[in-house]
Amino acid sequence: MLKIQGVKHFEKSRFFPFFSQNIRSFKYLALIGLGSNIEPEKKRFDMLFRVMMDDKRFKILSTSPMLINEAFGFKEQKDFTNAVMLIQTNLHARALLKVLLYYEVKFKRKRTFKNAPRTLDLDLLYFSQKVKRDKWCEVPHKGAKERVSVILPLGMI
């Protein structure tokens, strides 16, 4: 069996994984990275799923199973739960990122220090086939191609 350093296992919940048959005609595709290491991670991901399903600005196309993996950066913390979500939207990249940051606050994210434990971390990993780099928004996300927490879940959708 293949063993990847830091990777523990995949888990499922009510909405992770999820695959939609109903595709609407939104302008853009976006890949969102989800992360959490403050309990209850699964419940929080499912709550975010419901909130985004009810938000008319988005159509969720699919989600990955949840990957349990070791923390990186600041290692003296609980393992992380990570997943990816593929959505459709008419929002531009910066506007979408603003909504994601709002959701982090709504789910009580506190930014105490770099790589600190978090209730919810939402990253805009990819946005259609666009490349955008400014002080507010970087797409593709700088860690998207290297992080196991993105690569393995992405391979599951």
Swiss-Prot record:
Domain of life of the source: Bacteria
InterPro entries documented for this protein: Hppk (IPR000550), Hppk_sf (IPR035907)
EC class name: transferase
PROSITE patterns assigned to the protein according to its UniProt record, in alphabetical order: HPPK (PS00794)
Catalytic activity: 6-hydroxymethyl-7,8-dihydropterin + ATP = (7,8-dihydropterin-6-yl)methyl diphosphate + AMP + H(+)
One example GO MF annotation: ATP binding
A Pfam cross-reference name: HPPK
Key words of the record: ATP-binding, Folate biosynthesis, Kinase, Nucleotide-binding, Transferase
EC number: 2.7.6.3
Single biological process term from Gene Ontology: tetrahydrofolate biosynthetic process
Pathway info: Cofactor biosynthesis; tetrahydrofolate biosynthesis; 2-amino-4-hydroxy-6-hydroxymethyl-7,8-dihydropteridine diphosphate from 7,8-dihydroneopterin triphosphate: step 4/4
PANTHER family according to UniProt: 2-AMINO-4-HYDROXY-6-HYDROXYMETHYLDIHYDROPTERIDINE PYROPHOSPHOKINASE
Protein family according to the UniProt entry: Belongs to the HPPK family.
Protein role: Catalyzes the transfer of pyrophosphate from adenosine triphosphate (ATP) to 6-hydroxymethyl-7,8-dihydropterin, an enzymatic step in folate biosynthesis pathway.
Name recorded for this polypeptide: 2-amino-4-hydroxy-6-hydroxymethyldihydropteridine pyrophosphokinase
Source species of the chain: Campylobacter jejuni subsp. jejuni serotype O:2 (strain ATCC 700819 / NCTC 11168)
Lineage: Bacteria, Pseudomonadati, Campylobacterota, Epsilonproteobacteria, Campylobacterales
